[in-house]
Amino acid sequence: MSRLLVLKSSILGDYSQSNKLVDEFINHFDQQQIVVRDLAQQPLPVLDFQVATALRAAGELTAEQQAIVTLSDTLIDEIKAADTLVIAAPMYNFTIPTQLKNWIDLIARAGVTFTYTEQGPKGLIEGKKAVIVTTRGGIHKDAASDIITPYLKTVLGFVGITEVEFVYAEALNMGDDFANKGLASASEHLAALTA
């Protein structure tokens, strides 16, 4: 797990529990081998007509389209340079933050990070792992309300990242006792991953 790409997506900045847990985790690694991208502090463009057409354009690109493709290429290069992705994915209204979804929309590119074959889709990013730290106000793990786990497993697997470890910090809005237990459980899980 030597080279890490860290993706933070919480809008809460220094108050974010997912960011704090991720920071605690990455402190166990060589800081020279870590790239941190705070998607809330450095927002990415939303998938709209301009972005979609730029990522699918053939032939000569406009300056705006080229800027979008260059950004997408940079994000994909960050993944390729890493051994492990560490993703902070707090639950907002049962799903991931918009900021993380914007990143996904820019890295999921046909012919670049996945392709279609006669056997179905095939991810083109291989040999990578992902650790996903997901924080929730309530208790959702293994429940129908946990949309994050299957979604991120699916989208990461679609681009070829199939070794995915989830770390859950739950019940954070259910009082101090529950919150402290949820955070302690997540910290223990993360510590075990550094061993």
Swiss-Prot record:
MF terms in GO: electron transfer activity; FMN binding; oxidoreductase activity, acting on NAD(P)H as acceptor; oxidoreductase activity, acting on NAD(P)H, quinone or similar compound as acceptor
Pfam families with a match to the protein in the record: Flavodoxin_2
CC cofactor: FMN
Chain sites annotated for binding FMN: S10, S16, Q17, S18, M91, Y92, N93, F94, T135, R136, G137, G138
EC number: 1.6.5.-, 1.7.1.17
Record note on cofactor: Binds 1 FMN per subunit.
Role summary: Quinone reductase that provides resistance to thiol-specific stress caused by electrophilic quinones. Also exhibits azoreductase activity. Catalyzes the reductive cleavage of the azo bond in aromatic azo compounds to the corresponding amines.
Subunit structure: Homodimer.
Record-stated family: Belongs to the azoreductase type 1 family.
Protein's recorded name: FMN-dependent NADH:quinone oxidoreductase
Organism: Vibrio vulnificus (strain YJ016)
